Amino acid sequence: MQFIDLAEIHVKAGKGGDGIIAFRREKYVPAGGPSGGNGGNGGSVILKAVSNLQTLLDFRYAHVFKAENGQRGGPNNRTGACGADLVIEVPCGTMVWDAETGELLGDLTTPGQTLLVAKGGKGGLGNKHFLSNHQRAPDYALPGLEGEERHLRLELKLLAEVGIIGLPNAGKSTLISVLSAARPKIADYPFTTLVPNLGVVRQPNGDGTVFADIPGLIAGAHTGLGLGHEFLRHIERTRLLLHLIDATAEDVVAAYQTIRDELVAYGHGLGDRPQIVALNKIDALDASQITTLQETLAAYVGQRVFAISAVARQGLEPLLEAVWQELGVSVSH
């Protein structure tokens, strides 16, 4: 399935139904009064967050959404039927902006959360409404009002607690596939992963924590180079970053700093986000090489550096324990 995380749509609420002019025409009532009913209200347009969608793909070709109009009033004081609301489902994590003013209208983060984006027009008043002591036979009614109309920009930011970051080919997709049930495309060349992958990793108590593998980060990603600029927004909501570094890289310190520079340059607090640093692919090195790399990198970053092999499933338990500790999850031994 194609991953689409930006979309623009046009929404229009329904017009209110017109009020009508009518008079009672009954046998034995020679001077029947006004009986024109009010129009029904137009339907509104509502966005609703759902958990079964992961992308804005549905909006790639469908751009215009319109709710039903209200029905006109009827004789005998009958009010017209209201137009049905139009409920548009979006993925959890969708931010909704007014595309013309730039105003943030809402941030739909919870399943079932709704946002009214265009209110239906009010139904017009029938001539019955204008009956008074001074006007016994009003011969006028009001039309229904137009519904609200808006041009919206939808921006999806994935709801993951842990973002796995690193240069292309650091082993991010392999790690998320090993830790969770996610099955991303994996191959030994850069930019295999062209979309963020989500995986649910089980905590010791059985609860799930969402990890996201963020692709395409290279030097200059924040300016649009590589694929990273497209996906950096998806780690804005994370509580923790898991920085994965290829232990077989020519310079692990430079690899670390490249990503670090991109986070700081992108802004939005990513440079200050708590992070865990891990060297991956240690199965390709001997013990002394691993120790040297760990010590060198730990001295540079000023914190512990974990050594793992996602492929060989080495060192994953202490890494996960550190993740749970950082997230405040109880770990029983």
Curated annotation (Swiss-Prot):
EC number in record: 3.6.5.-
Amino acids binding Mg(2+): 173, 193
PROSITE patterns referenced in this protein's UniProt entry, alphabetically: G_OBG, OBG
Keywords for the protein's UniProt record, in alphabetical order: Cytoplasm, GTP-binding, Hydrolase, Magnesium, Metal-binding, Nucleotide-binding
Location in the cell: Cytoplasm
Enzyme class, spelled out: hydrolase
Record GO terms (molecular function): GTP binding; GTPase activity; magnesium ion binding
Cofactor: Mg(2+)
Function: An essential GTPase which binds GTP, GDP and possibly (p)ppGpp with moderate affinity, with high nucleotide exchange rates and a fairly low GTP hydrolysis rate. Plays a role in control of the cell cycle, stress response, ribosome biogenesis and in those bacteria that undergo differentiation, in morphogenesis control.
PANTHER family in the cross-refs: DEVELOPMENTALLY REGULATED GTP-BINDING PROTEIN-RELATED, MITOCHONDRIAL RIBOSOME-ASSOCIATED GTPASE 2
Subunit and interaction comment: Monomer.
Protein name, as recorded: GTPase Obg
Organism taxonomic ancestry: Bacteria, Bacillati, Cyanobacteriota, Cyanophyceae, Acaryochloridales
